[in-house]
UniProtKB/Swiss-Prot annotation:
This is FMN-dependent NADH:quinone oxidoreductase. PANTHER family: FMN-DEPENDENT NADH-AZOREDUCTASE 1, FMN-DEPENDENT NADH:QUINONE OXIDOREDUCTASE. Its EC number is 1.6.5.-, 1.7.1.17. Its cofactor is FMN. Signal peptide: none annotated. Binds 1 FMN per subunit. One of its GO terms (molecular function) is FMN binding.
């Protein structure tokens, strides 16, 4: 199994989402030595935001692209190749102003590309990125999975929507909630997330042994 880990929190290694997602990937690797891992660290190596050269370059024949168009479209090609090569995708993000990080949004902009990850046909758009299992690891200061605050969670609906549009409909969410509500809340949130990670790993081990 090929695993793609995408981390995006501006807090880097100190981030709860990065920590849990990284531990998740490492446990999957340990569970099966044949598994492989590719890490896309969007903090250490941020992707450029799409611009006019990208917008025109993706519709320009390769041989006719300007050097700048070739550069920015080349970035998109690299992250798309990483995505298509993966069987399992782990996306880690903090909950920033009720949504995903801007670094992760830039990654989404590079993978959501007409002609490569989706195509328009007689019946409308069709996602071309299929057969993937996606896990979203989301850390938030408050609790947004239930109660009145649910209305402020634009991160998970957005990611489910855009990933589904591209063909990735098998999506699970691992939340690390309430980390801004005191040390005890942090401990509880991390324990709950770790338990879910361990359950997923155990399930995959059982399936492989069956």
């Amino acid at each position: 199994m090929s695993i793609l880990l995408v981390t995006s929190s501006p807090r880097g290694a100190a981030s709860h989402s990065t920590r849990i997602a990284t531990e998740f990937a490492e446990k999957l690797l340990a569970a099966d030595p044949s598994n492989t891992l590719v890490v896309r660290d969007l903090v250490a190596n941020p992707l450029p935001h799409i611009d006019a050269d990208y917008a025109t370059g993706i519709y320009t024949p390769v041989e006719a692209r300007t050097p700048r168009q070739a550069e920015v479209v080349g970035v998109s090609d690299v992250v798309l190749d990483e995505l298509f090569a993966a069987d399992t995708v782990i996306l880690a993000t903090g909950f920033i102003n009720f949504n995903i990080s801007s670094t992760l949004k830039s990654w989404v902009d590079h993978i959501a590309r007409s002609g490569r990850s989706f195509a328009y046909g007689e019946n409308g758009p069709k996602g071309l990125v299929t057969g993937k299992k996606v896990y979203i690891v989301l850390a938030s200061g408050g609790i947004y999975s239930e109660g009145a605050a649910v209305q402020f969670d634009h991160a998970i609906p957005y990611l489910r929507g855009v990933l589904g549009f591209l063909g990735m409909t098998d999506v699970d969410v691992i939340r690390i909630e309430g980390v801004g509500m005191g040390p005890d809340a942090v401990t509880a949130a991390l324990a709950k997330a770790t338990a879910k990670v361990d359950a997923v790993v155990a399930s995959q081990q059982a399936a492989a042994a069956a």
